[in-house]
Amino acid sequence: MAQSHSSSINYFGSANKVVYEGKDSTNPLAFKYYNPQEVIGGKTLKEHLRFSIAYWHTFTADGTDVFGAATMQRPWDHYKGMDLAKMRVEAAFEMFEKLDAPFFAFHDRDIAPEGSTLKETNQNLDMIMGMIKDYMRNSGVKLLWNTANMFTNPRFVHGAATSCNADVFAYAAAQVKKGLETAKELGAENYVFWGGREGYETLLNTDLKFELDNLARFMHMAVDYAKEIGYTGQFLIEPKPKEPTTHQYDTDAATTIAFLKQYGLDNHFKLNLEANHATLAGHTFEHELRMARVHGLLGSVDANQGHPLLGWDTDEFPTDLYSTTLAMYEILQNGGLGSGGLNFDAKVRRSSFEPDDLIYAHIAGMDAFARGLKVAHKLIEDRVFEDVIQHRYRSFTEGIGLEIIEGRANFHTLEQYALNHKSIKNESGRQEKLKAILNQYILEV
């Protein structure tokens, strides 16, 4: 990586550049499993994993929750307004360099404050965007994706593209227009649409079909404008079932895929899937990844984990090796994520308030996914599950099963077969055996 842009302040004083020291290292500021240059399956770990740091949780979050005030100690937070925005850029690129992180991601309002008018807001964005572009040029760090924050400001109380207020729809369009221009200017490899407040609380005051139609209209406008300005990055949509609204329109992978297909958007969008959102939807993360993968719509990942005992978006750093292994299994089976990556949409706990906790947390997440990648690659290489699945469905490779697959069977022929074939014998699914094998691979690979 090229030498970084200089900064007058050392924001992460006790942390040097994080390097790989191996699994026997006791240094908390070293990678134990993530060796960026290690080659697995013909690609380096850095190429496989495409790690990205989320600007919002890392540099703007202050630890405020519904029960208490801010707790985070950040060397840059005594600044205000645009000065604060500039200091955050310096801190961000210092951290990217220390972690050798190849990508980052942001909402528009993460990097620059809103002004008193849309024009002033865009001027603020332009100023910080110029600074970021300079740092990107000097560091080699790239923008994985950007998006528009259309949920914080009170104007979006009823939603953005699904708002009942046409003035809000227009403002949201202007904001995404600027976001797409930002994406092109900074070379974003993707542009994300997250539902924010695109949903509803009660059907008593909601025209559901009208709102879905408007959401689709909005996205088609975005597709058209991207073509107009020559932005060729991948469009991504991020499912979430609830929070902040009771019923989010992009509930889960299946619902979102149905929406994209219904409105003719599936050739323009892929899915950005978040582990914690899968938990909120009552799914495993690997279920969501598989659902997107089999439809050819797996685009990128927000890497985090939810707390199984809590019913809200906790956005914890991913440390569950079962989850990272099964996630990487799906990603490898997908042939990778293309222009997507693993973006750490995760925040340190409110009680982990020192700057170095940000470094520890990202090391933990990067190591967890590196370990998951290695185990998943070995599982695929050894055909541990593939052979089991192939054997399990073998009845469809011959006889009546093959007739079904080839379209030669119908209800009449199948009824005749069932009448003549009096004995049905099922075989065990061996679920416990397979879980034991998975344990063995996680522990020994």
Swiss-Prot record:
Superkingdom of the source?
Bacteria
Q: How is the cofactor bound?
A: Binds 2 magnesium ions per subunit.
Keywords for the protein's UniProt record, in alphabetical order: Carbohydrate metabolism, Cytoplasm, Isomerase, Magnesium, Metal-binding, Xylose metabolism
Catalytic site positions: H107, D110
User: What SUPFAM superfamilies does the annotation carry?
Assistant: Xylose isomerase-like
**Name of the top EC class for this enzyme:** isomerase
Which HAMAP family does this one have?
Xylose_isom_A
Report the EC number(s), separated by commas if there are several: 5.3.1.5
Q: How does it assemble?
A: Homotetramer.
Instruction: List the NCBIfam families hit by this protein, alphabetically.
Output: PRK05474.1, xylose_isom_A
Source species of the chain: Bacillus subtilis (strain 168)
A single Gene Ontology CC term = cytoplasm
Coarse class of the primary localization is cytoplasm
Indicate where this protein resides in the cell. Cytoplasm
Under the heading PROSITE patterns, the entry gives: XYLOSE_ISOMERASE
Sequence similarity: Belongs to the xylose isomerase family.
Name the UniProt record assigns to this protein: Xylose isomerase
Enumerate the cofactors the protein uses. Answer: Mg(2+)
Residue positions binding Mg(2+) 1: E238, E274, D302, D345
